[in-house]
Design a protein with these regions (language model features):
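Alpha-helical transmembrane segments of multi-pass membrane proteins predominantly involved
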Residues: 1-221
Length: 221
């Protein structure tokens, strides 16, 4: 029974890494948002399973928060924002998809090696979940670095935060009060980012980070 419990936990955490790799492959905003919704859904299942095996009821609330806000509310709101702003739906990348995917594979390998070596005495389930969580975190950071569009960078940041939640729940769980504060912080940040994007669109007629950098450079001359 314990073996099956560990296998399911590893399957869900590994699936989260796989969906993070899928995010790197996307070149359209709508597809990226759909994959992020799937990312958050897998996180929900992983946290709910951790709640079951740890007998930690507060983690069910964490899973519900992830499902409601990250898998439903935020992706739907970003879809509407893209339509209202008329944002260019193709994602411009700093490098090609191929090199980005190779970099992602390298980061996953690095996360596995580092985490398994620095936590030799940890609980096996927690140890491997932390390795998966670090992989998700690094892949989210890679999404932020390799995308020029501000919306895709926001999605990368939120996927990075999913990795942090996976790490917290996989270790010993996260106190409910902390998770609620994190959820509200993310919601507030999302509202601020939405207003910020509207203002950028009104002022510069684009949300492309490269175009904003070019404008900043011209102002300095």
């Amino acid at each position: 029974m314990n073996g099956l419990v560990f296998d399911i936990a590893h399957l869900l955490a590994g699936s989260l890494v796989l969906v993070s790799m899928m995010m790197l492959y996307q070149d359209r905003l709508y597809a990226l948002l759909n994959v992020f919704a799937l990312h958050s859904l897998v996180l929900t299942l992983s946290v709910a399973w951790q709640a079951f095996i740890q007998d930690a009821p507060h983690l069910y609330v964490t899973a519900a928060i992830a499902l409601l806000f990250k898998a439903i509310v935020i992706p739907v709101a970003l879809h509407r924002m893209i339509r209202q702003l008329g944002i260019h739906r193709e994602i411009e990348t700093v490098v090609g998809i191929g090199p980005t995917m190779l970099a992602g594979i390298g980061l996953v390998a690095l996360a596995m090696v580092v985490m398994l070596r620095v936590t030799p005495d940890a609980n096996p389930l927690a140890r491997e979940d932390l390795a998966f969580a670090l992989s998700v975190l690094l892949l989210g950071l890679l999404v932020m670095i390799t995308r020029r569009n501000a919306v895709s960078q926001v999605v990368g940041f939120m996927s990075l935060e999913n990795g942090l939640v996976l790490a917290a729940t996989g270790a010993r769980g996260m106190p409910l009060v902390v998770e609620i504060s994190v959820a509200f912080s993310i919601l507030i940040a999302f509202i601020v980012i939405g207003v910020f994007l509207f203002r950028i669109r009104e002022r510069f007629d684009t949300v492309d980070v490269r175009a904003l950098d070019d404008f900043k450079g011209r102002r300095r001359k």
